Amino acid sequence: MKKNIKNSIFAGECMVEVSGNTDNLYKNQIKMNLNFGGDTFNAAVYFSRLTNKLFNTFYFTGLGKDHLSEMMIERFKYENLKTDLIQRIKGKYPGLYSIQTDKKGNRSFSYWRNESAAKEMMKKCNLDNLEKFISNTELFYYTGISLGILKPKDQNKLIELSKKSKLTAFDFNYRNSFHGNKIKSQSL
């Protein structure tokens, strides 16, 4: 790392995004687009682009040891995101979502994240080393979705880790269908 450059950490889940026009579903082939997305990933990319000369932008998540996870890491590097904090978890994979757009242009989403490696990111990391690293970090960013994918014990660990940074940014990003219990979510 370069001297005098500050560190930032974005914690959450980057997912595989599948989108495209399914109007031709009954033909032999339909063309779909493959990309990567997610609230913390998108925020990290734009933060990195805006502050590239001033900040190292680290992405903290869990990924598998599969081809799509490798592609995702290459994309992180292309976007100048540091991959040192990525936890590699055998037998787990990136979450996936698809975007469907109806004839009026309204979008709807479907999610597959039961086997998401990001749900395990707190279990595989060395918390002592991560805590020391975060204490020298200018910004720690995470969202309600970052918490929502984790088990309660891991949610509390992430919240406690975030407090070690000089500045913590939290976007609640509440989704009723995802979080369910509003009172429990507000307590976090």
List each model region and its residues:
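Residue-level signal for short, function-critical loop segments
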Residues: 14, 63-65, 145-146
